């Protein structure tokens, strides 16, 4: 019998993925990662629901303590980034370093299993012509999570299954209901796990970064107001600046060194190109010449036509056909050919 370890968060998606694979004849082992430090996190609602689902399905349930890894790779990563004036994207980092990598290792070393599965909405396809595993958008475009999975290596893609990739979200709920799963009607998470457990990103960051007052200035250096911490702002932000101006002003730069928030009109927050580092080429090998693609510079943004120019040291330059508003350092840029993820990386801070 084929064996698979399913990552269970306690939500409907991962629960249904486990049920589907169980029905397909897999020997399924549920695995929950204990991520958060703090009182009550060892018996959080998600962990309790995951255990209940395993009991319903009659499968084993393992819990792995990943709190120190999560602290290093996610909490410290976020705090360092925000403190330096960037807006990190924790989810892609978490998928690679906290979830998929450790899950594959644990499954292999502790459970004698070479396949894992999750409830992500994405698809994996092996291309015999190139010998590469390709990452594709999910059938349900509205739920597609390929943007957050761009950093998975070929080895991790080869070991992973996404049972929900060919399904609509409504089908997931229906299957969960048909199986009588406790999580069938469970609401979806609406924010980052850290935000949900702390109330807001501001509250989370203020636990680690002491608010420090400074100037809000325009691009000419004129003081327009005061802020209470650079880490409370992000590129492109308009609301909550607390300044009066005859025209809309947006955050165009976060100067953590001089503790300044720089604002300007919309044109100042618009760029024709950017550079990206820590690039991972997914469905194709790294090209030696520029390629055409469609890029997303944030999760819910529409793909925009772009020329991807390879640089040295796992970097690329993105030249947009049309100038883009609010390109945010620290966020992921992921480029596609249709539904196929070609590659992605982290947007760099702009050089002056």
From Swiss-Prot:
Alphabetically ordered keywords of this record: ATP-binding, Cytoplasm, Disulfide bond, Nucleotide-binding, RNA-binding, Transferase, tRNA processing, tRNA-binding
Catalytic residues of the enzyme: 94, 193
Region Interaction with tRNA: start-end pairs: 143-145, 298-299
SS bond list: 94-193
Family annotation (SUPFAM superfamilies): Adenine nucleotide alpha hydrolases-like
Cellular component terms (Gene Ontology): cytoplasm
Presence of the UniProt keyword tRNA processing in the record: yes
Catalytic reaction(s) noted: S-sulfanyl-L-cysteinyl-[protein] + uridine(34) in tRNA + AH2 + ATP = 2-thiouridine(34) in tRNA + L-cysteinyl-[protein] + A + AMP + diphosphate + H(+)
Gene Ontology BP term (one): tRNA wobble position uridine thiolation
Family affiliation: Belongs to the MnmA/TRMU family.
Protein name listed in UniProt: tRNA-specific 2-thiouridylase MnmA
Gene source species: Nostoc sp. (strain PCC 7120 / SAG 25.82 / UTEX 2576)
């Amino acid at each position: 019998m084929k064996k698979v370890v399913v990552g269970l968060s306690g939500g409907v998606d991962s629960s249904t993925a486990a049920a589907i694979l169980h029905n397909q004849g897999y020997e399924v082992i549920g695995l929950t990662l204990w991520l958060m430090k703090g009182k009550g996190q060892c018996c959080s609602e998600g962990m309790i629901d995951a255990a209940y689902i395993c009991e319903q399905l009659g499968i084993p349930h393992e819990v792995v303590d990943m709190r120190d890894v999560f602290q290093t790779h996610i909490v410290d990563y976020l705090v360092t980034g925000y403190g330096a004036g960037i807006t990190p994207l924790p989810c892609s980092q978490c998928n690679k370093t906290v979830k998929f990598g450790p899950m594959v290792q644990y499954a292999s070393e502790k459970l004698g299993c070479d396949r894992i599965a999750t409830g992500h909405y994405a698809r994996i396809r092996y291309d015999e012509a190139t010998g590469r595993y390709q990452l594709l958008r999910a059938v349900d475009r509205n739920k597609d999570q390929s943007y957050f999975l761009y950093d998975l290596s070929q080895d991790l893609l080869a070991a992973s299954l996404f049972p929900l990739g060919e399904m609509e979200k409504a089908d997931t709920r229906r299957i969960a209901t048909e199986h009588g799963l406790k999580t069938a009607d469970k609401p979806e998470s609406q924010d980052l796990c850290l935000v949900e457990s702390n109330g807001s990103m501001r509250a989370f960051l203020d636990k680690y970064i002491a608010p420090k007052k400074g100037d809000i200035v325009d691009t000419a250096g004129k003081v327009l107001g005061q802020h209470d911490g650079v880490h409370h702002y992000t590129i492109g932000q308009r609301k909550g600046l607390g300044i009066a101006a005859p025209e809309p002003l947006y955050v165009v730069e976060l100067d953590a060194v001089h503790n300044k928030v720089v604002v300007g009109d919309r044109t100042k927050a618009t760029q024709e190109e950017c550079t990206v580092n820590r690039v991972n080429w997914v469905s194709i090998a790294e090209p030696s010449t520029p390629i055409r693609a469609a890029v997303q510079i944030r999760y819910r943004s529409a793909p925009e036509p772009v020329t991807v120019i390879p640089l040295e040291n796992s970097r690329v330059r993105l030249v947009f056909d049309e100038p883009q508003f609010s390109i945010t350092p620290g966020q992921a840029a992921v480029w596609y050919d249709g539904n196929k993820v070609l590659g992605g990386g982290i947007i760099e801070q702009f050089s002056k």
